[in-house]
């Protein structure tokens, strides 16, 4: 525990707050164009082929976004909307692509949590 004199000489330093989603620039969503759509494998102990896309945003940032849900129609030059939110077992993936917006189709045959996957209400 420092003395009063020590604190006067050298005050306490506040911890630096790091932005977890710098490319968003304080916006809830951003638009971008897919430059590459591919699959990648997660960290240990998980095993899968996770669908991701490299996206060039309207503000010039190049980010990697996760494509949630089963199946997708994305390819190079698809225009997508992204939101913040990382994928814990994929290093470097800090954004999610929003399904059912712009060129991204919603997940077909989705019955529950439809709003998260851009699926319409079944008849």
UniProtKB/Swiss-Prot annotation:
Residues with 3-methylthioaspartic acid modification: 89
Annotated disulfide bonds: none
Domain of life: Bacteria
Function: With S4 and S5 plays an important role in translational accuracy. Interacts with and stabilizes bases of the 16S rRNA that are involved in tRNA selection in the A site and with the mRNA backbone. Located at the interface of the 30S and 50S subunits, it traverses the body of the 30S subunit contacting proteins on the other side and probably holding the rRNA structure together. The combined cluster of proteins S8, S12 and S17 appears to hold together the shoulder and platform of the 30S subunit.
Family of the protein in this entry: Belongs to the universal ribosomal protein uS12 family.
Gene Ontology, cellular component aspect: small ribosomal subunit
Keywords assigned: Methylation, Ribonucleoprotein, Ribosomal protein, RNA-binding, rRNA-binding, tRNA-binding
Species name: Chelativorans sp. (strain BNC1)
Name assigned to this protein: Small ribosomal subunit protein uS12
InterPro entries cross-referenced by the UniProt entry: NA-bd_OB-fold (IPR012340), Ribosomal_uS12 (IPR006032), Ribosomal_uS12_bac (IPR005679)
NCBIfam families, A to Z: rpsL_bact (TIGR00981)
Quaternary assembly: Part of the 30S ribosomal subunit. Contacts proteins S8 and S17. May interact with IF1 in the 30S initiation complex.
GO biological process: translation
Encoding gene (name): rpsL
Coiled-coil annotated residue ranges, if any: none
A GO molecular-function descriptor: rRNA binding
């Amino acid at each position: 525990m420092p003395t009063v004199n020590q604190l006067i000489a050298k005050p306490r330093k506040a911890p630096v707050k790091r932005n977890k989603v710098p490319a968003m620039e304080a916006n809830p969503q951003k638009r971008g164009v897919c430059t590459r759509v591919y699959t990648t494998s997660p960290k240990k102990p998980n095993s899968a082929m996770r669908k991701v896309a490299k996206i060039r945003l309207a503000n010039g940032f190049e980010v990697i976004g996760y494509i949630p849900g089963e199946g997708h129609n994305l390819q190079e030059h698809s225009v997508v909307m992204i939101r913040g939110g990382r994928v814990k077992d994929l290093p470097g993936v800090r954004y999610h692509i929003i399904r059912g917006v712009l060129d991204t189709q919603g997940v077909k045959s989705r019955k529950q949590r439809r709003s998260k996957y851009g699926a319409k209400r079944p008849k």
